[in-house]
Amino acid sequence: MFSRKTSIAILAAMAALTTQVWAADATLLGDKFTSNGADPSASADGMIPAYSGGITNPPEGYVAGGDHIDPFRNDKPLFSITAANMEQYENRLSVGQKALLSRKKGNYRMDVYPSRRSCALPQFVYDATKKNATRARLIDDGNGVADARIGVPFPIPKSPIEIYWNHNFHWHGHRYHAVTSGANVYNNGSLTKIVREDWRYNFYADPQGPISQHANDQFNWMGIWKAPPRFNGSGFSMINTINQLAEPRKGVMFNPSTRRIMQAPAAAVTYEGPLSTADGMRQSHDMFLFSGSPDRYNWRLLGKREIFVPYNAYKASASTTTHEALMTPFHPNPDYLRYELHRVWVLEATQKDGFRMKQARRVFYVDEDSWIFLMSDIFNNRDELIYVQHAFIKNYYEAPACVFEFDVMHDMTNGNYNIDHIKLGFGPADLDYDLDPSDFGSSALRRKIGR
């Protein structure tokens, strides 16, 4: 039997060994791996290029605060994938993409362009990521993260749940503002525009570091809706916590019909709480493809694959693109969408015993360069594909930062879809807006709505 002194010595030795392993991992960043943890090499067939640092400066003619000039506007599609030829490319397609291509309604196709590994981050983010590799750790059975800041916590992941946390913490500035102009698009061709002004203050990404009272707070978020008419003037302010088992999300909301600010019920901000403006097509944990506590799922890594994924979405997100042109029945207009071949981590989340989730199994395709979830295939309890979700990213090269620009949630049961975070007509997000924590909460919400 071990004595207490011996046990302490063993634990200390294990901790020292773990620290040595982490330190060794950190030396691989910028060498065997990119500074953000990706494989820098080209694919065997050369279709995925070697990583050369991404875009770190705006192209000539870019005006700060204005539309992003598409740095790849002269690229032409290499080929198009349709229902007629999808078998030729099936090893590089997701289950969801095959389902979209196979539908009898609509005219879905994927235009595949040259692969451009455009993602880049500021040097201070890479520096923080390297430090995280020596110190970040999972807590509470993987439901939280400690001792990490600014960059992804696990650039060389050792477990599937660490990949989820990398997505959750990918850097896109710490003071965010945008006006979004999404929509619900119906199979009869009609659409309902959803206009929302967003503010977000990210404690985790703050270069000054969070104060102790916000140690478990990832970010503050506030949204005020301007459309559709029945939601005009509605507002919501929320604290998104990191370990949501230890401390659930907290939110307040303003309902213009009652003219009162009230505490948001837990069901409105967690798990499968429906998002009221999405007409049944989106739930709370569908934001950013997955948002919130991972505790109700078992997470499994299915491997790393070369997949055609949405990327470099400059054309679709240009403020000159109209809703009517982009948001066609059954799926967005393929003329505006760009797909490229990239390496992705394939991550599966399956509901744990004891839970009965509508979204019982989810498969995520995770960009190796940015750690952003680019696609999600969502299955019900009968293992039927019910939703397909695609995220479209681009480099905000003025930062630089690879940003989740918008996403599309396809309801595979009826052909409707919801599109969110897109900013048509309003210009790109500001990643360094003048914000501080006092700009959130019930008092701030009251000030914003002017009541």
Language-model-detected regions and their locations in the chain:
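Solvent-exposed N-terminal domain segments of exported/luminal and surface proteins
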Residues: 26-249, 255-257
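Bacterial N-terminal signal peptides that target proteins for export
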Residues: 1-9
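Extended beta-strand-rich segments in extracellular/periplasmic secretory proteins, especially
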Residues: 180-229, 287-364, 374
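Gly/Pro-enriched, hydrophobic low-complexity segments
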Residues: 27-53, 81, 94, 222-294, ...
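Gram-negative outer-membrane assembly/targeting C-terminal domains
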Residues: 432-451
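Sec/Tat signal peptide C-region and signal peptidase I cleavage site
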Residues: 17-23
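Hydrophobic helical h-region of N-terminal Sec-dependent signal peptides
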Residues: 10-17
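Short alpha-helix boundary/capping motifs
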Residues: 1, 61-62, 279, 399
